[in-house]
Swiss-Prot record:
It holds the Pfam family tRNA_Me_trans_M. Residues 372-391 are annotated as: Disordered. The lineage of its organism: Bacteria, Pseudomonadati, Pseudomonadota, Betaproteobacteria, Burkholderiales. The active site is at residues 100, 196. ATP binds at residues 9-16, 35, 124. The gene is mnmA. InterPro entries: MnmA-like (IPR004506), MnmA-like_C (IPR046885), MnmA-like_central (IPR046884), MnmA-like_central_sf (IPR023382), Rossmann-like_a/b/a_fold (IPR014729). Its main location: cytoplasm. It catalyses: S-sulfanyl-L-cysteinyl-[protein] + uridine(34) in tRNA + AH2 + ATP = 2-thiouridine(34) in tRNA + L-cysteinyl-[protein] + A + AMP + diphosphate + H(+). Gene3D superfamilies: Adenine nucleotide alpha hydrolases-like domains, HUPs, Translation factors. This is tRNA-specific 2-thiouridylase MnmA. The record marks 125, 351 as: Interaction with tRNA. SUPFAM superfamilies: Adenine nucleotide alpha hydrolases-like. Residues 146-148, 308-309 are annotated as: Interaction with tRNA. Residues 95-97 are annotated as: Interaction with target base in tRNA.
Length: 391
């Protein structure tokens, strides 16, 4: 009887390497596949693609599996990077890793793996898949400190039915132990951080290669000009560092934070104090939705939600549709609202709002707007909250 073939996405890191080894030990016919998703800067100081490939080959030789490289750079630029730039240009803060998983790692990669006669694919993500009554559920990892279901919430039934996450039941510390015990050449390699195509380079420097600077006023809620920004695309909601007001002693003397953007007037609004009302939200509206089960939860469903990675689940109530002026959007586009029990800090348009029912990831959507702690205010795409005197 032939062994079941599993194609493993190998990045050169410890997690995907241990994933391949575990599956080989379990008797699967394992094939490693290295994805190259970015063409530029291959010889630059910030690009590790060449070394990553060397590490993949070394690991494959050690554990005794075949490995090949596949180039998805064109698909990545078309499906992920173009959207990344569009979102930043519109003043939002996107999460390209979420889109990369849905469009590249579990679509282009999955399609290629099937062409290699694979029955399943596997990655080193920390998450779990469970089949129940013919449906597939996406679950949090056993090690909640490493859980990556937030980034995987756009996966659908077809993708999950073909996916394995061997590390979902294993603590990260155990993964490191396994790597050392079997002598993996990359056992002590640091975990990768940041957006894959940016690497370790300064984010603002990278973004400036693709988006022009467009200076404008930096104002407080009462309309006072306190500085000049270099372009709204270069700032994100809740940002503290890099604003350029560190030495300013005006106002309360507390740290400054980015609180809103007004695209029409090219104005960046800043406030002082971590818990300023403009940084706190009890409600949000999200669009571009995706549900793991293929359908949304029931209207009024009480659940938990994350509005950023590694955030604790925040208790909230799900609404099938937003109400009021914020409900306006592209015709036919599904949207939802969340009403939180407690105010959430720096809910950022462009990021993902991901819903959970305990351990089960239900799916989510892209945050479009978030009502702040003051009546009549909202942080949304292209609009600043109402000025203080208008409250």
């Amino acid at each position: 009887m032939s062994k079941r073939r599993v194609v493993v996405g190998m990045s050169g890191g410890v997690d995907s390497s241990v994933t391949a080894w575990l599956l080989k030990e379990q008797g699967y016919d394992v094939v490693g596949l290295f994805m190259k998703n970015w063409e530029d800067d291959d010889d630059g100081e910030y690009c590790s693609t060449r070394q990553d490939w060397i590490d993949v080959v070394s690991v494959a030789d050690l554990i005794g599996i075949d490995v090949e490289a596949v180039n998805f750079a064109a698909e990545y630029k078309d499906r992920v990077f173009a959207e990344f730039l569009r979102e930043y240009s519109a003043g939002r803060t996107p999460n390209p890793d979420v889109l990369c998983n849905a469009e590249i790692k579990f679509k282009a990669f999955l399609d290629h793996a099937m062409s290699l006669d694979a029955e399943m694919i596997a990655t080193g993500h920390y998450a779990r898949v469970r089949e129940r009554d013919g449906r597939f559920e996406l679950l949090k990892a056993f090690d909640h400190t490493k859980d990556q279901s937030y980034f995987l919430h756009r996966l659908n039934q077809a993708q999950l039915s073909k996916t394995m996450f061997p590390l979902g039941e294993i603590p990260k510390t155990k993964v490191r132990e396994i790597a050392a015990q079997i002598g993996l050449p990359n056992a002590k390699k640091k975990d990768s951080t940041g957006i894959c195509f940016i690497g370790e380079r300064p984010f603002r420097d990278f973004l400036n290669r693709y988006l022009p600077t467009k200076p404008g006023p930096m104002k407080t809620p009462d309309g006072k000009v306190v500085g000049e920004h270099i372009g709204l695309a270069f700032y994100t909601f809740g940002q503290r560092k890099g604003i350029g007001l560190g030495g300013s002693k005006s106002g309360s003397g507390e740290p400054w934070f980015v609180a809103a953007k007004d695209i029409a007037s090219n104005t960046l609004y800043v406030v002082q104090g971590h818990d300023h009302p403009w940084l706190l939200s009890r409600e949000l509206v999200a669009g571009n939705v995706s549900w793991v089960a293929g359908e949304p939860p029931a209207d009024g469903f009480a659940c938990g939600a994350k509005t950023r990675y590694r955030q604790a689940d925040a208790a909230c109530v799900f609404g099938l549709a937003a109400t009021g002026a914020e409900a306006a959007g592209p015709a036919g586009e599904a949207r939802f609202s969340l009403a939180f029990d407690d105010a959430q800090w720096a809910v950022t348009p462009g990021q993902s709002a991901v819903l959970y029912d305990g351990e089960i990831c239900l799916g989510g959507g892209i945050i479009e707007s978030a009502a702040t702690g003051q009546p009549g205010q909202a942080t949304s795409t292209g609009h600043a909250p109402a000025l203080a005197e208008a409250r």
